[in-house]
UniProtKB/Swiss-Prot annotation:
This is V-type ATP synthase subunit E. One of its GO terms (molecular function) is proton-transporting ATPase activity, rotational mechanism. GO terms for biological process: proton motive force-driven plasma membrane ATP synthesis. SUPFAM superfamilies: V-type ATPase subunit E-like. It comes from Thermus thermophilus (strain ATCC BAA-163 / DSM 7039 / HB27).
Length: 188
């Protein structure tokens, strides 16, 4: 999995950098626009209105800073959502990669270890050939479930106990921590 993580990390980092540059450019444009408006207002005022102008300028600068801060926050949220979308795309492309059989086998092993005495292993029909040897070795039945993607489910006796181990579920569970690390890496 470390090779996969490295590949994903490189792809995600490149996308993050591109998105960050785009977000920063947008924020700078908004900031420049706010500064230009404030400067135009300054030039339009007469000396007699200098005190009023300064108050208006302070309000405009505060509004501009708030607008920039809001735009940055929104851009950061968009960057993180784009990162998540691209990670999901990368995960969904894994079944087409040569390392997928080993990945799905490891997911199955983890699920079986988490549920001692499992009687069945459920997976997407396309993944069943990759799991036949493991199922035979562990003495569990293989079952197909087309809706189960990028993972497996170990099922206990009578089907009452189940342990699902899928990459998308792992991403969902870990997203808060991962997004915090991505944000820290990007924005400090």
């Amino acid at each position: 999995m470390s090779k996969l993580e490295a590949i994903l990390s490189q792809e995600v980092e490149a996308e993050i950098q591109a998105l960050l540059q785009e977000a920063e450019a947008k924020a700078e444009a908004v900031k420049r626009e706010a500064e230009e408006k404030a400067k135009a207002l300054l030039q339009a005022r007469e000396r007699a209105l200098e005190a009023q102008y300064r108050a208006a300028l302070r309000r405009a600068e505060s509004a501009g800073e708030l607008l920039v801060a809001t735009a940055r926050t929104q851009a950061r949220g968009e960057v993180l959502e784009e990162v998540r979308r691209r990670v999901r795309e990368a995960l969904e492309a894994l079944p087409k990669k040569p390392e997928w059989p080993e990945v799905v086998r490891k997911l199955a092993l983890e699920a079986l270890e988490a549920l001692p005495g499992a009687k069945a292993l459920v997976a997407n029909p396309e993944d069943l050939p990759h799991l036949e040897a493991l199922a035979k070795e562990r003495g569990v039945e293989l079952k197909a479930e087309p809706a189960l993607r990028l993972g497996v489910r170990a099922v206990g006796a009578e089907g009452k106990t189940q342990v699902e181990n899928s990459l998308l579920a792992r991403l969902d569970r870990a997203w808060d921590a991962l997004s915090s690390k991505v944000a820290q890496a990007l924005w400090g």
